[in-house]
Amino acid sequence: MTRGKPGRAHKQAATGEHGLVIAAHGRHYLVERDGGGFLQCFPRGKRSECAVGDRVVYEATAVDQGVVVRVDERRNLLYRSDQFKSKVLAANLDQVIIMLGTEPSFSEDLLGRALVAAESLGITPLILLNKIDLTARLETARSRLALYRDLGYTIVELTVHGAPEAAHAALEPHVAGRASILIGQSGMGKSSLLNLLIPGVDAQTREISEKLDSGKHTTTFTRLYHLPADWGQGGMLIDSPGFQEFGLHHLSEGMLERAFPEFRPRLTECRFYNCRHLQEPGCGILGAMAEGKIDPRRHQLYAQLLHESEQQKPW
């Protein structure tokens, strides 16, 4: 990935065939050829610059291998980062689906960070609350999510195992015709959801793993699945490995303040043009929080992300 300017396409002229990156594992990429079939590809040069969802130009170097010579311009690039490194998730997305469950208890910090990541790129977020048949913790989960519902985020409640047909009917309108990435902690039901929406997903995953030479590491790579053709609208669903943290060290102060939708209308109310919304007098954000119009949890997340963005980054 090009550090500092993620999403920048290669500028050199290139000839070759066109395809779509449908899986990534390290510096190995599986490209779906526009003309049919698949090819394992490697990036040209030392730096890996491809992401699942990228449209690329490649040149075949063998019957089943090739080299990516150009990445087409991206609409967006979703990735996470910490103080030491960054991790590409996917490119050219319409939607970020955040999978939560009533049990085990979900991380509200990860949820908030995923929403900020989506907002910073102008990507629509969708929150799924799975396992609503486990009623012991359902009301607690709903209470924790009330803040996000009040902010205008769409929350779909379902139980993939207990009522698969109802879950399918609830999800299809949200995913059909869109490029979505599915993210979340382990144990929230992502695998069950994939099996519900993508017929034969296990066989597809094994095939992708074999073509990538990733062997037994079938849960450690990001992969793209086309939604069923009989839906009639196209669309794709990208599955990313489960993770427990979602660092956003790459987001600048200006990007962060605009990634909180409840902050945006109040940014012009600050007394100082360079207000950081931490302790400055006459701050529109702090004033709104004092009036109960901004939840302190959201401001706490903003302050933490701002602190992280100030850390020195070697990448």
UniProtKB/Swiss-Prot annotation:
Q: Which residues bind GTP?
A: 130-133, 184-192
> What cofactor does this protein call for?
Zn(2+)
Q: What is its main location?
A: cytoplasm
Where is this gene product found?
Answer: Cytoplasm
Query: Enzyme class, one word?
Result: hydrolase
CDD domains annotated for this entry? S1_YloQ_GTPase, YjeQ_EngC
Cofactor: binding details:
Binds 1 zinc ion per subunit.
Q: Which InterPro entries match?
A: G_CP_dom, NA-bd_OB-fold, P-loop_NTPase, Ribosome_biogen_GTPase_RsgA, RsgA_GTPase_dom, RsgA_N
Which residues of this UniProt protein bind Zn(2+)? Answer: 270, 275, 277, 283
Q: Where would I find the CP-type G domain in this sequence?
A: 82-246
Q: Which UniProt keywords apply?
A: Cytoplasm, GTP-binding, Hydrolase, Metal-binding, Nucleotide-binding, Ribosome biogenesis, RNA-binding, rRNA-binding, Zinc
Q: Please name the GO terms that the record assigns under molecular function.
A: GTP binding; GTPase activity; metal ion binding; rRNA binding
Q: What is its EC number?
A: 3.6.1.-
**Biological processes per GO annotation:** ribosomal small subunit biogenesis
Record carries keyword Hydrolase: yes
Instruction: List the signal peptide residues.
Output: none
Q: Which domain of life is it from?
A: Bacteria
Q: Which SUPFAM superfamilies match?
A: Nucleic acid-binding proteins, P-loop containing nucleoside triphosphate hydrolases
Q: Tell me, in a sentence or two, what this protein's role is.
A: One of several proteins that assist in the late maturation steps of the functional core of the 30S ribosomal subunit. Helps release RbfA from mature subunits. May play a role in the assembly of ribosomal proteins into the subunit. Circularly permuted GTPase that catalyzes slow GTP hydrolysis, GTPase activity is stimulated by the 30S ribosomal subunit.
* HAMAP family for this protein: GTPase_RsgA
Q: Which family does it belong to?
A: Belongs to the TRAFAC class YlqF/YawG GTPase family. RsgA subfamily.
Q: How does it assemble?
A: Monomer. Associates with 30S ribosomal subunit, binds 16S rRNA.
Provide the protein name. Small ribosomal subunit biogenesis GTPase RsgA
